[in-house]
Swiss-Prot record:
One of its GO terms (biological process) is succinyl-CoA metabolic process. Binds 1 Mg(2+) ion per subunit. Residues 9-244 form the ATP-grasp domain. Pathway: Carbohydrate metabolism; tricarboxylic acid cycle; succinate from succinyl-CoA (ligase route): step 1/1. It catalyses: succinate + ATP + CoA = succinyl-CoA + ADP + phosphate; GTP + succinate + CoA = succinyl-CoA + GDP + phosphate. It comes from Shewanella amazonensis (strain ATCC BAA-1098 / SB2B). Its cofactor is Mg(2+). ATP binds at K46, G53, R54, G55, E99, T102, E107. Belongs to the succinate/malate CoA ligase beta subunit family. The keyword Transcription does not apply. This is Succinate--CoA ligase [ADP-forming] subunit beta. One of its GO terms (cellular component) is cytosol.
């Protein structure tokens, strides 16, 4: 689960980190009034969406005119912002963040992730702030400095000082950086974050460190013990199909291919996508129906898959372990009849009562292609998607 910038900065402020005075606004009038409360003669207005690249897409504006703030809010509120990180439809803008303007002397990067290789929280800092860190990692990886947080000892001030020296900070900035580092590390651990970024972490013209942006990703599996964070969820930013799938405990991720995939088990689902790709097809989705492939869940899975107009064929790959294949076959037949599937459906069943399941499918009278193996299933569905 991701948080908006204004939500991230509210958390930063709770931990005593330096952030700009700002207000998240729902209407153009609120945005103008927010500028008045902030004071000064220059403000920054930002569209609040779960995507980067807002500035290049016109979603960020620096202005000294309150009427321009009103016009910006009128332009974007209720509209979709398309950036390089969104799909072609973009993300809906429901709030505008109005902030005081900060004079910048230099831009740095500070972030943290859960690193699966080291099984630790790893902090990263760089002098290359204000640009995509992925680009820095690819082109100049030596400019990214790391600190690994020991899960027993926790974050240590010496780690902050080590990063600060590598960033070329002066003694005053070093103290500020240490406070920011320790606060962020504690916040990361307290709230079960999976990702945290301040890009850029700026040095102002007065020589002080300031958190100019904030990006936070939370471990969705930990939300049961993070009620405060869970309440920050903005469903408008979710993919509509993924949100619908979650209601039925289906794990769905939309992709850009034309072969719909319905599988039970995440590992088998990834293997299915790989073999479809191996035989020249492009998966349209990842969809794990879980252990209980009931008629209702299979029906909803078909509806979700077929809501993607790019899908030209569907591959159902089920391993019957706890659930018998004949029961799964009956569920598939019922779902196909209920949904009215118009594209070719290839089914591969393996495991308990697999032969009986294949017989049930064959006697259904429906246009369902029963595959003999996973390779056969992949080849059949790729041909079907191509209209062969």
């Amino acid at each position: 689960m991701n948080l908006h910038e204004y939500q991230a900065k509210a958390l930063f402020a709770e931990y005593g980190l330096p952030v700009s005075e700002g207000y998240a606004c729902d209407t153009p009038q609120e945005a103008v009034e927010a500028a008045g409360r902030i004071g000064g003669n220059m403000w920054v207005v930002k569209c609040q969406v779960h995507a980067g690249g807002r500035g290049k897409a016109g979603g960020v504006k620096v202005t000294g005119d309150k009427e321009e703030i009103r016009a910006f809010a009128e332009k974007w509120l209720g509209k979709n912002l398309v950036t390089y990180q969104t799909d072609e439809n973009g993300q809906p803008v429901a709030k505008i963040l109005v902030e005081s303007c900060t004079d910048i002397a230099n831009e740095l990067y500070l972030g943290a992730v859960v690193d699966r290789a080291t099984r630790r929280v790893v902090f990263m800092a760089s002098t290359e702030g204000g640009v995509e860190i992925e680009k820095v990692a690819e082109e100049t990886p030596e400019l990214i400095h790391k600190a690994i947080i020991d899960p027993i000892a926790g974050p240590q001030p010496f780690q902050a000082r080590d990063l600060g020296f590598k960033l070329g900070l002066n003694p005053t900035q070093m103290k500020q950086f240490t406070k920011i580092f320790m606060g962020l590390a504690q916040m990361f651990l307290d709230h079960d974050f999976a990702l945290l970024e301040i890009n850029p972490l700026v040095i102002t013209t007065e020589g002080n460190l300031h958190c100019l942006d904030g990006k936070i990703g939370v471990d969705g599996n930990a939300l049961f013990r993070q009620p405060k964070i869970k309440d920050m969820h903005d469903p408008s930013q979710d993919d509509a199909r993924e949100a619908h799938a979650a209601k039925f405990e289906l794990n769905y991720v939309a992709l850009d291919g034309n072969v719909g995939c319905m599988v039970n088990g995440a590992g088998l689902a990834m293997g299915t996508m790989d073999i479809v790709n191996l035989h020249g097809g492009k998966p349209a989705n990842f969809l794990d129906v879980g252990g209980g492939a009931t008629k209702e869940r299979v029906s909803e899975a078909f509806k979700i898959i077929l809501s993607d107009s790019n899908v030209k064929a569907v591959l159902v790959n089920i391993f019957g372990g706890i659930v018998r294949c004949d029961m799964i076959a009956e569920g598939i037949i019922g779902a196909v009849k209920e949904v009215g599937v118009k594209v070719p459906v290839v089914v591969r069943l393996e495991g308990t009562n697999a032969e009986l399941g294949a017989k049930v499918l064959a006697e259904s009278g429906l246009d369902i292609i029963a595959a003999k193996s996973l390779t056969d299933a992949a080849q059949q569905v790729v041909k079907a998607a191509e209209g062969k």
